[in-house]
Amino acid sequence: MRPALARRLLSGLGKLLLAALLSTIVSVALLRFIDPPMWTWRLERALFPPAKVAEVKHDWVPLEQISRELQLAVIAAEDQRFAEHNGFDMDAISSALKHNQHSERVRGASTLSQQTAKNLFMWSDRSFLRKGIEAWFTLLMELGWDKSRILEMYLNIVEFGPGIYGAEAAARHYFGKPAARLTRYEASLLAAALPNPWRYRVKPPSPYVQQRSAWIRRQMGQLGQITLNKVHQAD
């Protein structure tokens, strides 16, 4: 390859990479203020559903219209250091690595920030490339958003069951009420299904969901409202 052609190719690749990076920054900046009508995880589920979905349900609501019980339940279940870390829980990552070295059952260590980045922007792949891009988006979100916006985004796009996206749709589907009126027990059931909402049954709750929801309620009692206060004070 001629040197001049190689330089042009490298220059073109560099400009393309720079444009891609800038587009990610702009996207995250806009989503600080704009609620997304669609996101990558939901789009992939629509195109390649694990099973047939009769109806897709989703209603966006602001964080203040989501029960504080559910806010605390997902923190207790998924990321108890959410208010303290900067997107990555290094203690949880270290613990998961040690566990996975000696167990056939893999344990994850993704924070709520990482899960939000995955649901918003990423495809369902376990490659190092995907994890690297996910980490980049997580960093951008932590730099540009406050914790309450991350929690609001998570609770509005996470899947609580086949085709059921967000807290409002889940509350109305399972309990016939708005998300603002969810009780601690109901919130813990929803949070218990989050590891695999296509597998774990919320209503009537499977034995696993019953057991895990009881554990979540105990964790909620230990964390207390002070945890949520830290999240909201970070605005």
From Swiss-Prot:
User: Upper taxonomic classification of the species?
Assistant: Bacteria, Pseudomonadati, Pseudomonadota, Gammaproteobacteria, Aeromonadales
Record membrane topology: Single-pass membrane protein
Q: What does this protein do?
A: Peptidoglycan polymerase that catalyzes glycan chain elongation from lipid-linked precursors.
Per the record, the similarity remark reads: Belongs to the glycosyltransferase 51 family.
Q: In which pathway does it act?
A: Cell wall biogenesis; peptidoglycan biosynthesis
Q: GO BP, one example?
A: cell wall organization
Question: Which reaction does this enzyme catalyse, per its entry?
Answer: [GlcNAc-(1->4)-Mur2Ac(oyl-L-Ala-gamma-D-Glu-L-Lys-D-Ala-D-Ala)](n)-di-trans,octa-cis-undecaprenyl diphosphate + beta-D-GlcNAc-(1->4)-Mur2Ac(oyl-L-Ala-gamma-D-Glu-L-Lys-D-Ala-D-Ala)-di-trans,octa-cis-undecaprenyl diphosphate = [GlcNAc-(1->4)-Mur2Ac(oyl-L-Ala-gamma-D-Glu-L-Lys-D-Ala-D-Ala)](n+1)-di-trans,octa-cis-undecaprenyl diphosphate + di-trans,octa-cis-undecaprenyl diphosphate + H(+)
Cystine crosslinks: none
Q: Under what name is this protein listed?
A: Biosynthetic peptidoglycan transglycosylase
Q: Top enzyme class of this protein?
A: transferase
According to its UniProt entry, this protein's organism is Aeromonas hydrophila subsp. hydrophila (strain ATCC 7966 / DSM 30187 / BCRC 13018 / CCUG 14551 / JCM 1027 / KCTC 2358 / NCIMB 9240 / NCTC 8049)
GO CC annotations? Answer: peptidoglycan-based cell wall; plasma membrane
